[in-house]
């Protein structure tokens, strides 16, 4: 039989507590921890000479233990006649000065200002269970009355939201409010489902109210107090600690590869995020060495967006290859300084050990793993704010291949790389104009952002490579026709790598880009080497409106129209493009804007199979011939949609495509002093009819 109240109403019922204590008899029920787990914080705020009122004392041994270590001015009150009688009998001989009285905590009858401390162990929680909190409010008012100026209300509580909110809002004016979180202090014999952390609320009475709220939170009994600006911030911080403790409770219950909880560790002083930890358990069927219980993997700085670390599938693969029962994957945050691997290990060790799987031996050595043994490298080189997408960061990072990469990150989705370009040193860029680069050649890290430039002949995104390769479907006669150069309309600029590549390497190609966000254009020009000229232009505006305007004018046609635009609505199962871009009405406008040889290319990122089928059905209703090229390891696929099936059958890949791909490869290489690093044939190898 559970001895914890089963419903909230029972907490405030005198009859319930009367029955409860009769059932317990001589066995003390240490409500919310015992003296040993609480003495550190109690001695901090209660002095042996203080006059202490213990409200709702129950048959806890806490008062007896305080008495035995020198606290002799303890007055204990409780609503239960049974417990008061029992406690007086139990202490009559051994503790003659320890008194227990049957009194209502809301009307004690004591003189105002007659106590230095009021000690409460769970009584507030019991009384606050009423919906309106009226009973608890009357008790807190009585506490304020009987305490002297400088006196303290010390309340041991589970800090459920309605309880802590009531107490803090009651004392915030005219009192200093401090909360200690004693996570993990519960009695080992407590119910296994009883996983909430214990908090100690300390409210100090001022003679004169300060001009500002004094609200503080401490971790543990000796943690430095962190000042909070509002009641809402304090309540939020308490809630975070509770959520963390509940997560720990679940993690100690067993391993579960389908659940990947994560938490963020913040800097104690600044409150800024410092580490993000993701817990990845191995599957039950995994064959792991007996001693491989637990390991910590440090993601190199700047690599947290990589598929292996930034996706659920990638993390599962990482855990499987590491061969541990549980792997904690740690990502470091930008704007934080990290000395070295040893310093990071020392900083993380006290926290990560709380995340260990059940059954791990106490003396088990826990390894810290990483790639290359260092912390990686990241340099934030630019920041800004977009009215459309919020804050952004431009940063240079070192990739797994040793090259440096420049990334555009929007902070509202910091795990996603919006745009990426490979970098080369100024010296390498200069020599590249004289000599073609070797694809596998590596370069040393440059000393500063100004010494690094974007390698415009390298496309980081595979779906961009597929789009370039798709130009082969136009035929080489069209690509090499200088009298009628290939015209391209691209919706979605990003860092500008794709349109810049087409302009630089496709003979005489003319590219028009439509971009909604002027900040994105500025970033592309400032940091990603994007250059507007007579063959590469940008129109700022809504892509849907621009296509509608072009279609209504009926004066311009394009050989290629590309959609490479993401959706800001994360609730949909499709992140590229926004749904409006694949409505039948718009697809028909795209069709009408294409030349007879025209090609429509769509970057499709859709996790919802039913939604994907709906998109494909709509595309098929407009275009007679549709091909798909999936991207390995990603959800992306590129749809290549022909305006006309031409000479080949609409349900087969053209037999001449491979030869055209080889010819396009030669043309791209011949059209520039620097060879573009792209394999056109490989990009078209897995083309499928859909």
Swiss-Prot record:
UniProt feature, compositional bias: Basic residues: 433-442
The entry's keywords: Methyltransferase, Multifunctional enzyme, Transferase
GO BP: any one term: methylation
Enzyme class, first EC level, given as a word: transferase
Enzyme Commission code: 2.1.1.-
Reaction equation(s) it catalyzes: L-lysyl-[protein] + S-adenosyl-L-methionine = N(6)-methyl-L-lysyl-[protein] + S-adenosyl-L-homocysteine + H(+); N(6)-methyl-L-lysyl-[protein] + S-adenosyl-L-methionine = N(6),N(6)-dimethyl-L-lysyl-[protein] + S-adenosyl-L-homocysteine + H(+); N-terminal glycyl-L-lysyl-L-glutamyl-[protein] + 3 S-adenosyl-L-methionine = N-terminal N,N,N-trimethyl-glycyl-L-lysyl-L-glutamyl-[protein] + 3 S-adenosyl-L-homocysteine + 3 H(+)
GO molecular function, one term: protein-lysine N-methyltransferase activity
Highest taxon above the source species: Eukaryota
Coiled coil (UniProt feature): none
Disordered: region residues: 427-451
One Pfam assignment: Spermine_synth
InterPro entries, sorted: Lys/N-term_MeTrsfase_sf, Methyltransf_25, SAM-dependent_MTases_sf
Family: Belongs to the methyltransferase superfamily.
Record's function text: Dual methyltransferase that catalyzes methylation of elongation factor 1-alpha (eef1a1 and eef1a2) at two different positions, and is therefore involved in the regulation of mRNA translation. Via its C-terminus, methylates the N-terminus of eef1a1 and eef1a2. Via its N-terminus dimethylates lysine residues of eef1a1 and eef1a2.
Protein's name according to its UniProt entry: eEF1A lysine and N-terminal methyltransferase
Gene this chain is encoded by: mettl13
